[in-house]
Curated annotation (Swiss-Prot):
Ubiquitous. One of its GO terms (biological process) is mRNA splice site recognition. One of its GO terms (cellular component) is U2-type prespliceosome. It holds the Pfam family LUC7. This is Putative RNA-binding protein Luc7-like 1. The gene is LUC7L. The modification Phosphoserine is found at S332, S336, S363. GO terms for molecular function: identical protein binding; mRNA binding; RS domain binding. May bind to RNA via its Arg/Ser-rich domain. It comes from Homo sapiens (Human). Keywords: Coiled coil, Phosphoprotein. InterPro entries: Luc7-rel (IPR004882). The lineage of its organism: Eukaryota, Metazoa, Chordata, Craniata, Vertebrata.
């Protein structure tokens, strides 16, 4: 990669897809299914194992450092759960690697001579010491490259101790089997990267293997897979707790709403009972008022009839007394007139008739006035 391409990639990684206003690059978002989620989390095997004996070639999905920068910015604000996709990808890759390791072990078991369990255990011990020496040498070289010379020297001293143990283990292994068989190269399969390791490999060969890009790449992938499994488990546990808390809150709200609804119904019922009670009271009051008004009307009518009856009775009695008085007075006048007529002799009949008419008219007028 040229220096210009490296600078461009660095700018993409730092500033994202919108670093220079290129709209064509912004058409593909990091959430697109075509984007490699393992690349966004910096654990894609196609990137890690590039340039090794197990180079996988170019990934079928989009790899873009700018999209990774966009994802890192967005993941600080909300959880996108891309770890689950990356974990599935790495699990399938590691499962394939483990399958190749088992096949290599079967081929070695078929091609190499059968040895006893005791000899096999001694050979396995030599392999383990070789692996430890190779890891320590690789670590010492890494520390020396970083400038930690003192730490590197300490690790080299540990390497010398392990070499002494390895020499003793090789002597035990050599003495436990014939010389012809011992000279035969005994191989084993690396449990990390499925590469072949020899029992008699020198330290340089072991350091190159355990410090090589292939072995370290597989270590990185396996460690990243363990980290993703732990992260996914924690997030799933957190999500389950959040879901449980939301469900409890929802149930509590439903209980509160049911309680408030029952209280509302009780209040409605009490209000309806109060309305019915007030309505019945008002109805009874209306009825009592109506009955009292009816009784007062009956009493008033009765009193009116009584007063009218008494007034009629008094008027009739007054009429009867007036008639009786008038008849007595008339009788007395007639008697007095008859007595006077008998004393005076026969009067003039015309005068008598006129006087009688006048007297009768006066009596009628008087009677009418009294009535």
């Amino acid at each position: 990669m040229s220096a210009q391409a490296q600078m461009r990639a660095l700018l993409d990684q730092l500033m994202g897809t919108a670093r220079d206003g290129d709209e064509t690059r912004q058409r593909v978002k990091f959430t697109d299914d075509r984007v490699c989620k393992s690349h966004l989390l910096d654990c894609c095997p196609h990137d890690i194992l590039a340039g090794t004996r197990m180079d996988l070639g170019e990934c079928t999905k989009i790899h873009d450092l700018a999209l990774r920068a966009d994802y890192e910015i967005a993941s600080k604000e909300r959880d996108l759960f891309f770890e689950l996709d990356a974990m599935d990808h790495l699990e399938s890759f590691i499962a394939e690697c483990d399958r190749r390791t088992e096949l290599a072990k079967k081929r070695l078991a078929e091609t190499q001579e059968e040895i006893s369990a005791e000899v096999s255990a001694k050979a396995e011990k030599v392999h383990e010491l070789n692996e430890e020496i190779g890891k320590l040498l690789a670590k010492a070289e890494q520390l020396g490259a970083e400038g930690n010379v003192d730490e590197s020297q300490k690790i080299l001293m540990e390497v010398e101790k392990v070499r002494a143990k390895k020499k003793e283990a090789e002597e035990e292994y050599r003495n436990s089997m014939p010389a012809s068989s011992f000279q035969q190269q005994k191989l084993r399969v690396c449990e990390v990267c499925s590469a072949y390791l020899g029992l008699h490999d020198n330290d340089r060969r072991l350091a190159d293997h355990f410090g090589g890009k292939l072995h370290l790449g597989f270590i990185q992938i396996r460690e990243k897979l363990d980290q993703l499994r732990k992260t996914v488990a924690e997030k799933q546990e957190k999500r389950n707790q959040d879901r449980l808390r939301r469900r409890e809150e929802r149930e509590r709200e439903e209980r509160l709403s049911r309680r408030s609804g029952s209280r509302t119904r009780d209040r409605r019922r009490s209000r309806s009972r109060d309305r019915r009670r007030r309505r019945s009271r008002s109805t009874s009051r209306e009825r009592r008022k109506l009955s009292r008004s009816r009784s007062r009307d009956r009493h008033r009518r009765h009193r009116s009839r009584s007063r009218s009856h008494s007034r009629g009775h008094r008027r009739a009695s007054r009429d009867r007394s007036a008639k009786y008085k008038f008849s007595r007075e008339r009788a007395s006048r007639e008697e007095s007139w008859e007595s006077g007529r008998s004393e005076r002799g026969p009067p003039d009949w015309r005068l008598e008739s006129s006087n009688g008419k006048m007297a009768s008219r006066r009596s009628e007028e008087k009677e009418a006035g009294e009535i």
